[in-house]
Each structure stands twice: as structure tokens, then as C-alpha cells.
Amino acid sequence: MEIFLDTANIEEIKKGASLGIISGVTTNPSLIAREGRDLKEVVMEIVSLIDGPISAEVISLDYEGMVREAEELSKLHPNITIKIPMTWDGIRAVKTLSSMGIKTNVTLVFSANQALLAALAGATFVSPFVGRLDDTGHDGVYLIEEIKTIYENYNFKTKIIAASIRHPLHVTQVAKAGADIATVPFKVLTQMFAHPQTKEGIEKFLADWQAMKR
């Protein structure tokens, strides 16, 4: 499984990139707005830091507008993947963009049927929202399992990006469920490193070493 960062914050991306294990970045209009910068400016800075898929989302909700925005964004850099919302016009746009060789990421997916439609349209990625489903009393991880089974049954090439990851346990769960990618906030990435016994072990090793030197 691969790890993407779900952020538009350049400092977080720089820190994540320094690990050498981050394979891509996902953004959305909310994350871009939080940075108070132009979408294209932010995206171009991100592609200079991470050599992998960088998801940038369209703002238009109509078919023509989505295709137009997608064409403009895709011309900025080969690594840019266009995030398209899971709607009727969105799926139409994905089908068109797929035929043009433009990579797409269908976002705001909350059901296996939606993921099936995205794959049939030729989406490069599909993003089921695990945490948001959990918030409404549904099982977000089970949705990943359902999508994985369907995709394997019919040999779909669409990759599953587990999105709306709230904590490290989600990462473990979606990895076991078969997600191709987990896109995580920087906070969750840092939490994945932590375990009290790791800290205790390091402290003991250092204490023993210092005692020996005396």
C-alpha cells in the first residue's frame, strides 16, 4: 500500500517528502482555501516536491465546466490528477477525460455502487470517505472491502484511495481491507510513528549506554 498526504500546506509536504516514503498528495478546495493561495500556484509548488500523483479538484459542477477546468489543470504538469465529484455530470466528465488520457480521481464516494460507476467510466482513482461514513454510523472500512472485491471480480484497474482518514487505526484497517493507497493528514502521519513502548525502549537503551560509560 502507498501513503499519500492529504494537505495543501507546503511545509507539511516538505516534511513528509523528506521521509522518502510519500507517493502522492491529495488536495481539495477546502484545503486550498485554508492556505489562502491560488490553486495553480499551490499545485505547481507541490509537484516540485513530490514525484507522484497530485490531486487537484475542479470547482465547476456542470459537465462542460469540469472538462474545461480539467484540461487546464492537466496541462500544468503530467503528475496532476483531476479530482471530480461523484455526480451524474462528474461521471460523464470522467469518461470523457479518460478517453483523452487525463488522469482522474473520483471523490466523495460513499457506496460500492458509486465506486463501480467510477471504474466503469475509467477513473484512475476512486476515493471512498472512510471517516465521514463512520461519523454517520456506517462502516467506512467495510466499504473499502466491498469495493476491493468488486474491482478484483471484474479486473478493474481503478485504484482505491482510502480518504477521510482520522487516526492511525484507520490506516491499519484500510491496509488490511485492501486499499491501494491511504491519503492521510500530516497529523495522522506523525501519529503513525508513535508508540509508548518504542519511546520506553529508546530511553532504556540510552540509559544503559550512559551507565556503561560511567
Curated annotation (Swiss-Prot):
Keyword line: Cytoplasm, Pentose shunt, Schiff base, Transferase
Active site positions: K83
Catalytic reaction annotation: D-sedoheptulose 7-phosphate + D-glyceraldehyde 3-phosphate = D-erythrose 4-phosphate + beta-D-fructose 6-phosphate
Keyword Nucleotide-binding assigned: no
Superkingdom: Bacteria
This protein's GO CC annotations: cytoplasm
Compartment(s): Cytoplasm
EC numbers: 2.2.1.2
Molecular function GO labels: aldehyde-lyase activity; transaldolase activity
GO biological process, alphabetically ordered: carbohydrate metabolic process; pentose-phosphate shunt
Principal subcellular localisation of the protein: cytoplasm
Pathway: Carbohydrate degradation; pentose phosphate pathway; D-glyceraldehyde 3-phosphate and beta-D-fructose 6-phosphate from D-ribose 5-phosphate and D-xylulose 5-phosphate (non-oxidative stage): step 2/3
Function of the molecule: Transaldolase is important for the balance of metabolites in the pentose-phosphate pathway.
NCBIfam families: fsa_talC_mipB
Homology family: Belongs to the transaldolase family. Type 3B subfamily.
Name of the molecule in the record: Probable transaldolase
Organism ancestry: Bacteria, Bacillati, Bacillota, Clostridia, Thermoanaerobacterales
